[in-house]
Design a protein with these regions (language model features):
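Bacterial Sec-dependent N-terminal signal peptides
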Residues: 1-23
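Generic structural signal for short, flexible, solvent-exposed coil/loop and linker residues
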Residues: 3-6, 118, 160, 217, ...
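Generic hydrophobic-segment detector
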Residues: 6-7, 24, 198, 216
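N-terminal accessory/pre-domain segments preceding catalytic cores
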Residues: 17-197, 220, 241-242
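Active-site neighborhood of thiol-dependent amide/isopeptide-bond enzymes
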Residues: 182-251
Length: 251
């Protein structure tokens, strides 16, 4: 009996000394059928140390990332969003906002929003992730921008492909088209950030608080209305797209 207990103790001690699975391994396991897409990214960057580390950073954090989307394309709220008028003279007062009136009328037809949760780890494509990494590194390496902040800051505040639970989109392309001309001024990043904050197009509309989903960057750019959260997300992504570290916070 004593010999058996000694054996069990040794086995237990052996397994307790084994290293835990890495965050990367856990993420790849959670990807399930989508694992191959993520492994394509790792293989693509196997000879580039920094970009490989960046890919690992995104994949390791991916299990907690997801989008909140309308259940299907027939969702009345989502369809109405595309046809909202950009002119709303009393946007600050929800009781007089034309946007609020539109969503109030929809709530009588569709009382509850119908959502679905889509996990990034299960749908992320290698093409999307590689494009995001390449675009982020391109602006980071431009004209000595990298000297202003560390690689760790780059991974945390420039590299991420989302800020909340918005739909995945090619927001870097859109933002670069709008703000790419600021790239030549990045030796003064604080001035650039201040200028963009003063000029960016998304305006507050209290009526948008009645919209039950989160807009994509392109939707915000097109509609030019949003909540405080929308405006914050739009500015954060705009700054990241040109290589200025940015994040959102609750005040």
């Amino acid at each position: 009996m004593l010999r058996l207990l000694s054996f069990l103790f040794l086995v237990s001690a052996f397994f307790s000394c084994l290293p835990e699975k890495t965050a990367l391994e856990r993420a790849l396991r959670e990807a399930g059928d989508n694992r191959m897409e993520l492994e394509k990214v790792l293989a693509y960057y196997r000879d580039d140390t920094l970009k490989y580390q960046a890919a690992c950073f995104l994949i390791e954090n991916m299990p907690d990332q997801y989008a909140v989307l309308p259940l299907d394309s027939t969702d009345t709220y989502a369809r109405a969003l595309l046809s909202l008028d950009k002119e709303d003279p009393v946007s600050w007062e929800i009781s007089r906002s034309l946007v609020a009136a539109v969503f109030d009328s929809i709530s009588k037809i569709q009382p509850e929003s119908r959502i679905k949760i889509v996990r990034d780890i299960e749908v992320m494509t290698s093409d999307y992730l590689i494009e995001n990494i390449e675009s982020a590194f391109k602006v980071w390496n431009r004209r000595g921008v990298a000297k202003h902040y560390s690689f760790d800051d780059f991974c945390s505040y420039v590299l991420p492909y989302r800020v909340a639970h918005e739909p995945l989109s090619h927001w870097r392309r859109t933002a670069l088209q709008r703000y790419g001309h600021w790239l030549d001024s990045l030796n003064a990043p604080q001035e650039v950030a201040r200028s963009i904050a003063m000029r960016y197009p998304v305006r507050y509309n209290a009526g948008m608080t009645k919209y039950p989903y989160i807009m994509s960057y392109e939707e915000m750019d097109s509609l030019q209305w949003g909540t405080c959260d929308d405006m914050t997300a739009f500015l954060t992504l705009s700054l990241r797209a040109i290589g200025i570290p940015a994040a959102t916070d609750v005040v």
